[in-house]
Every structure is written in C-alpha cells, then in structure tokens.
C-alpha cells in the first residue's frame, strides 16, 4: 500500500507497489486499484508507474512506462476510457535501456544501464553507482524518464547502477524502518548490490565510483571514506555531513534525540564530528564535493565542515561551490556544465582519460 488516493461512497482508490495476489513488490512498479466490498479492480493494466485523481464518476489515470517517454493521461468513466489528454512535451533525445532486477540475498531493487553501443565482447566496464539511497526517495522505477541522466552517464563509458537499499520506499515497512539509528546500513546495501550485480553484468570492480545528491551525496562521501576497498572515487552533491546540523523533524525521526547516548548515534552516522572525520578508513580516494551556496535545505556549512576535516587529515579533495544555486540546480547551463565536470572528474579518477 503506497497511498490512499480517494474515498468514494462505496469504494476506495489506492496506490500500491504490487497487484492483487503478488507475494512481493513488483520491481519499480506502482499501480492504482479500486477496492470495494466485492474485491479489487486494477485500473492500471500495463507495467509502469501510475497515479490517479478522481472526481465523482470520472478518474484521470496518469501513467509512465519504460517503453515510451513522458506520461500518458487517460480519462476514465465507469472504468472505460473516454478520452486521452494530449501531451505536447518534447521527446528526449536519449533512449534509456535499463535492466530492472533484484540484487543479492537481500533482493535489493536495482537498475543497470550499459552504454548504448555496448557489445558483449567489449569487456568489463568502469562502474558508476548513482543512488539516492535514503528515506522518501525511490529511484528504481519502471518509467522511461527516470533513467535519462543515468543513461547519459552510461553512454560516457560506464556501467551505471541505481539501487534502492534499505530505507527507501516501495518495498515494505520493515525495509524502510531498518535504518533506524543506522544510516550506514544504506552503504552496506550499495556494496551488496554492486558485488551481486558483478556476477551478471560486465562490471570492472577495480574501477568503481559513486555519485549522489542530498542524501545520495552523503552516501557517496560515506562510501569513499568508509569503504575505499570498494569505491575508488566519489562525487558528493549537497551532502549532509553532520546530522546535528540537519532538520530536527527529519533527523530525530531516524536517529532519535541527539542528547541521548552522549551523541554516539549521531557521531557514528555523520561524516564529521567536532573532533574531525568520523570513522574514516586509512586509504584515501578522490572525492569531489559540490554545493550550492544558496542552499537553504542542506546548508553549505555541511560541505565547509567536511572540507575542513579532510584538509586537517591531509586528504586531497575537490570542492566546487555553486554561486546562487540552491539545493537543486534548475539552471540549464549550470546543470549541463555540472554533468560535464562530473564526467571529467570520474574519468580522471578512474584512469579513463
């Protein structure tokens, strides 16, 4: 059960991660069901990501699928299609080719993307993990547009992995709650995913990188600092580095009261403490940190504290401050050039240049 969309006089409209009779979530799929005393009716018939709104007898079903770009909006009355809302959105120039799967013993939802021109005889590829990996952020979706940026990175010569480990939605309540007091478990799942997928896909485990933004930025920095045996380069965008500095309503939900246990839970899950780097491994790996100086969500102090701690520990790193940019990068020119800078950093760091 993902959400309650509408309550009718004699039925409910709900959003779910699996259809009737399914024993576990269908990887990347979100469906719309009509439920009444007679049973359930699945309004979304094709695999994909579906949502709906309803007013009286009319339902508008909005669908995204892997095979076509954008969204398709259908108008239904009494379960029958009466109209399709025309879309005038531009068609993307990239055609993603993700393989959706479940990785490892934990059955971690994952998507794998290879370069468009890749052939089986081309050999193993440098790896780029591209997770969000935290609460409220599902990245593995059966939707075309979800993989435009990952496919672009793949076309630069990488095998790209998007994995939704513990803490992400769409799996089960227990899956989401498994990270209580232990955000670092999300890193364990990325490690499990890449090792398991290497048994099925052409991955060069001697050249593994990771990039992410927000929670994904935290995860990317955590990866190169705590597991340099697995990750050889990382790009951390707008990372939370000290959980004491982030929103109370979010952080205390998962990590509890920072005053308890002498702050040990917060220190263990943060990248930096007042004493410097937190539980960093001895081996150094290249790390680029990117942060918008106008970010009012994850404030730039997070990156400044991490950079200061890295410098104090004698660890080389790169910091890219983005003047006038908030938590995301909606400016087209900035976003485009930022992608190019990231590819350049990854290729230099992995010896691909």
What are these model-derived regions, one by one?
Residues 1-8, 17-21, 35-50, 78-102:
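Multi-bladed beta-propeller domains
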Residues 6, 26, 53-54, 104:
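Residue-level signal for WD-repeat beta-propeller blades
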Residues 8, 13-26, 61-67:
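Beta-strand C-termini and the immediately following turn/loop, strongest in propeller blades
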Residues 16, 28, 34-37, 43-49, ...:
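Ampipathic, surface-exposed secondary-structure segments
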Residues 22-33, 67-75:
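Structural motif
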Residues 54-353:
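Serine-hydrolase catalytic core recognition
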């Amino acid at each position: 059960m993902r959400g309650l969309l509408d309550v009718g006089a004699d039925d409910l409209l709900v959003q779910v991660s699996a259809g009737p009779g399914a024993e576990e979530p269908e990887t990347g799929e979100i469906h719309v069901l009509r439920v009444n005393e007679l049973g359930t009716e699945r309004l979304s018939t094709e695999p994909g990501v579906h949502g709906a709104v309803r007013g009286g007898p009319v339902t508008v079903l909005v669908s995204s699928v892997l095979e076509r770009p954008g969204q398709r909006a259908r108008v239904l009355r009494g379960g029958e299609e009466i109209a399709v809302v025309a879309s005038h959105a531009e068609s993307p120039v990239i055609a993603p080719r993700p393989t959706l799967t479940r990785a490892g013993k934990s059955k971690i939802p994952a998507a794998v993307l290879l370069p468009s021109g890749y052939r089986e005889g081309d050999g193993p590829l440098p790896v780029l993990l591209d997770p969000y990996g935290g609460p409220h952020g599902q990245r593995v979706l059966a939707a075309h547009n979800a993989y435009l940026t990952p496919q672009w990175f793949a076309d630069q010569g990488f095998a790209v992995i998007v994995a939704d480990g513990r803490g992400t939605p769409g799996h089960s309540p227990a899956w989401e709650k498994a990270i209580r007091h232990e955000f670092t478990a999300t890193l364990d799942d990325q490690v499990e995913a890449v090792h398991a997928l290497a048994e099925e896909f052409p991955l060069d485990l001697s050249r593994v990188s990771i990039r992410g933004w927000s929670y994904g930025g935290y995860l990317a920095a955590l990866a190169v600092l705590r597991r340099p045996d697995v990750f050889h380069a990382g790009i951390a965008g707008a990372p939370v580095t000290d959980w004491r500095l982030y929103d109370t309503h979010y952080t205390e939900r998962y990590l509890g009261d920072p005053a308890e246990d002498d702050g040990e839970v917060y220190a263990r899950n943060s990248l930096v403490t007042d004493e410097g780097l937190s539980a960093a491994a001895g081996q150094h790996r290249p790390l680029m940190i990117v942060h918008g100086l106008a970010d009012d969500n994850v404030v730039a102090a997070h990156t400044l504290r991490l950079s200061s701690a890295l410098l104090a520990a004698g660890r080389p790193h790169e910091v890219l401050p983005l003047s006038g940019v908030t938590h995301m990068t909606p400016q087209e020119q900035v976003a485009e050039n930022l992608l190019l800078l990231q590819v350049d950093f990854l290729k230099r760091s992995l010896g691909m240049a």
